[in-house]
Amino acid sequence: MQNNNPCGLDGFAFLEFSGPDRNKLHQQFSEMGFQAVAHHKNQDITLFKQGEIQFIVNAASHCQAEAHASTHGPGACAMGFKVKDAKAAFQHAIAHGGIAFQDAPHANHGLPAIQAIGGSVIYFVDEEHQPFSHEWNITSPEPVVGNGLTAIDHLTHNVYRGNMDKWASFYASIFNFQEIRFFNIKGKMTGLVSRALGSPCGKIKIPLNESKDDLSQIEEFLHEYHGEGIQHIALNTNDIYKTVNGLRKQGVKFLDVPDTYYEMINDRLPWHKEPLNQLHAEKILIDGEADPKDGLLLQIFTENIFGPVFFEIIQRKGNQGFGEGNFQALFEAIERDQVRRGTLKELS
């Protein structure tokens, strides 16, 4: 393995979810275009696929997934990282501060793993080590197109105030993640700081969010989720208009965006060439730099899907940012949603 990529990282392998009601998770993923392609032979564990995305819904009892659901409610209880050599990556992780994780025997993934944020787990996956590799009953071996979601783009972690350096150090010391973006967002009433980390392979991105006050959406998440964890999951598409339209038809609800946002797009990005009426109709956000060479990014955020967790749909047209130009508009949109739900009082 290369020194700059000591664990031989090569992207996301899977995300694992658990919750008090696994039927709701199954229904939600089906509405998003995922298909159940395999079931565990002996446990209540289901594998969903769409494009290259693999979601595992783990409803087994007396295991880490159940414990995570008991603490946090529905959410992402584990993530799998693709690596060149799972055993070597695990050994490197342990030598650099990682804490080994071993699940209950009946729910063992058959993968080396370490403890991660908020009681979650990071599994190491290679060609030899696959999750529950010999325990699946395959029901659908065909590729699943679904709503055109293709891959996991990034996972955003919400952390307690004062813990950003701790988790940045965790990813840096074990995996050699580097800071690739830093944001300081101020809404009308609340604020947050975000530090985006990127893996040496360039395929894993993990922004860390930390609140600047007691009332922000980050603090609301930490309170409702009963701790730190994965706040949102960003999924790639090659045609965001088609994907979002399909998701809306299947009942997925997205954050509203003020009409004034679309009145400003041509001034912000005069070169963009996107169909403005379609952007407006689907409430899709657009971002880019002054120089067209840096490309565009199209994105949209769902409302909270289960608990305080939500999804982002993103299409990258050459831009590798996170929609920094949209953060302010999005932050204020979420503040409006907080006011509507009564968790934040509007300033008079």
From Swiss-Prot:
Which cofactors, if any, are listed as required? Fe cation
Q: What is its EC number?
A: 1.13.11.27
Catalytic activity, reaction form: 3-(4-hydroxyphenyl)pyruvate + O2 = homogentisate + CO2
Any one Gene Ontology molecular-function term assigned to this protein's record:
4-hydroxyphenylpyruvate dioxygenase activity
Membership in a protein family: Belongs to the 4HPPD family.
- What's this protein's function? Catalyzes the transformation of p-hydroxyphenylpyruvate into HGA. Has hemolytic and brown pigment production activity.
Please identify the protein, giving its name as recorded: 4-hydroxyphenylpyruvate dioxygenase
Source organism of this protein record: Legionella pneumophila subsp. pneumophila (strain Philadelphia 1 / ATCC 33152 / DSM 7513)
Which gene underlies this protein?
lly
